[in-house]
Regions:
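N-terminal redox-cofactor-binding region of secreted/periplasmic oxidoreductases
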Residues: 1-540
Length: 540
């Protein structure tokens, strides 16, 4: 006999962990949380400075794009967290809410209740900001579960040079990009608490695992959602060699992320009918937008060598790592306490006071002169200190798709993001790179710089384009593949219910109709907070 729960949540990422916490707060609600990955017991997950060591490990789905015809036919690596906490356990820990105009734009598309004014309380509900007293309390909180902090336990002098150099060219210094004004150059705010990574699992899930009405199962690979007609009634998952079916009497909530939520919908019979037929899957409900509208942020590195050994690269040597580890475990200070990011800048690339459309990530790590490295392998990096500025395209025009490779749930989906398909995307990245050159020429950064902007001739746009295509990476912020809206390509309505199906919602980054102006983890926590409220208010 199948076990019966009120709510079944598929995926213990940022959204799933919030939902498990909020829905199980009422002891009358029985909640099951299913996660395909294992427990988050890899020590490297919890040490911010060990960020790169969790990629291409058992805690990473390790997806790849199809060959990108506009990026030298490269297949581009797509890390995705496969553990409790999902990608919040493997990401670079940046806490960025985006721009108020992003959410007002969602509301203008017909998504009532999704304006920035509507959503700010949900951002605040989760947050426990370590520097709350220095922030505007109208935008921040110190009473939530999610630890957020500025880089106070380790900081290089390079980031102050970056902020001052940005200020010198017209991108003003800004204490708080998550406050009233996003524009400007700032220290990064990170999901770190007491020197340890703060993930969805550590903040929301683990503190409530002792609730009798909450069951969390790891290594539970969901194969399909079960329907009775057009009503979602259960889930089938694999645990080892055993196939298990469980039933939900209230709702099933899909929080598997922008690649796997559409994949699971299609495997379960919801998607474009022709796509389902191709793989021999019976169509439960045709929804043409499933897997469409894929958007992601893109960036590439521009590096500099520094005059001094005040960065991070020299810590790569084994002896330095031992010393840093001692400082971390004994004093909770030093390089292991920090994310790979120290600074951010947000601005209108045309610098005409328009909407934020571009971002710079600043890292106190040099990626070397020739960029002939694996960006996800720390030991590929040079031992010479420096810094990297990464021009980041916030609002790509190109759109991609997620589709099935087969009807086998174990096979990865086909991910075709169509990077740089629209020429405007490349033009923006070129323009952003030229702006970085200007920043590097400012004395505030030149004070620390031995050699900047390697390895190409800055006067040649062709060489810059070649460099972009050679080094371009995703910031792994995929969104939009189960978009919210009221048009024919919308998969969910503004309450995140799947159109045409009862008792099924999608709650993760896939519901974003348009990508936000910044890193996407903070918005996913917010989406889950709002979804939990809507679910609990639903009369069944």
């Amino acid at each position: 006999m199948s076990q019966l729960y009120d709510y079944i949540i598929i995926g213990a990422g940022s959204a799933g962990c919030v939902l498990a916490n909020r829905l199980s707060k009422n002891p009358k609600n029985s909640v099951l949380l299913l996660e395909a990955g294992g427990p988050d017991n890899n020590m490297n997950i919890h040490i911010p400075g060990a960020y790169l060591k969790v990629h291409k490990s058992k805690n990473d789905w390790g997806f790849w794009t199809e060959k990108q015809v506009n990026v030298l036919n490269r297949k581009i690596y797509l890390p995705r967290g496969k553990t409790l906490g999902g990608s919040s356990s493997t990401n670079a820990m940046a806490y960025v809410r985006g721009n108020a105009a992003d959410y007002d734009g969602w509301a203008e598309l017909g998504n009532s209740g999704w304006s920035y004014k509507d959503l700010l309380p949900y951002f605040k509900r989760s947050e426990n900001h370590e520097q709350f007293d220095a922030m505007d309390s109208g935008y921040h909180s110190n009473s939530g579960e999610l630890g957020v902090t500025l880089p106070i336990r380790f900081q290089t002098p390079y980031v102050e040079g970056f902020i001052d150099a940005c200020d010198a060219i017209g991108i003003p210094a800004n204490l708080d990009y998550n406050g009233a004004i996003q524009e400007g150059a700032s220290l990064v705010q990170s999901t770190i608490k007491n020197g340890k990574r703060e993930s969805g699992a550590t903040a929301f899930l683990k503190p409530v695992l002792d609730r009798n009405n909450l069951t969390a199962i790891s290594n539970a690979f969901v194969e399909k959602i079960i329907f009775d007609g057009k009503k979602a009634v259960g889930v089938q998952y694999k645990k080892g060699v055993k196939t298990i079916q469980v039933k939900a009497q209230k709702e099933i909530i899909l929080s598997a992320g922008a690649y796997q939520s559409p994949q699971l919908l299609m495997l379960s019979g919801i998607g474009e009918a022709s796509e389902l037929k191709k793989h021999g899957i019976d169509c439960v409900h045709e929804s043409k937008g499933v897997g469409k509208n894929l958007q992601d942020h893109l960036f590439y590195p521009i590096c500099a060598q520094s005059k001094t050994q005040e960065g991070i690269n020299h810590y790569i040597s084994p002896l330095k790592q031992l010393k840093a580890a001692w400082n971390y475990f004994v004093h909770k200070k030093g390089v292991f306490c920090t994310s790979p990011l120290e600074g951010m800048a947000f601005f209108d690339l045309d610098q005409k006071g328009g909407k934020v459309n571009f971002q710079l990530h600043f890292s106190p790590i040099s990626m070397g002169n020739e960029y002939g490295y694996d960006a996800y392998d720390l030991y590929d990096y040079p031992r010479v200190d420096g810094f990297t500025i990464l021009p980041t395209l916030l609002h790509p025009k190109s759109r991609g798709t997620v589709s099935l490779s087969s009807s086998n749930p174990k096979e990865a989906p086909i991910i075709q993001p169509n990077f740089l398909k629209e020429k405007e995307d490349l033009d923006q990245l070129v323009k952003g790179g030229k702006l970085v050159f200007k920043i590097m020429e400012e004395q505030a950064l030149k004070n620390y710089t031995k050699v900047s902007g390697l390895p190409y001739n800055r006067t040649s746009e062709d060489l810059l384009i070649e460099h972009i295509k050679k080094t371009l990476e995703t910031v792994y912020h995929p969104v939009g593949t189960c978009k919210m809206g009221n048009d024919e390509m919308a998969v969910v309505d503004p309450t995140l219910k799947v159109y045409g199906i009862k008792n099924l919602r999608v709650v993760d980054a896939s519901i974003m109709p348009k990508i936000v102006s910044g890193n996407t983890n903070a918005p996913v926590f917010m989406i889950a907070e709002k979804a939990a409220d809507m679910i609990l208010k639903t009369k069944l």
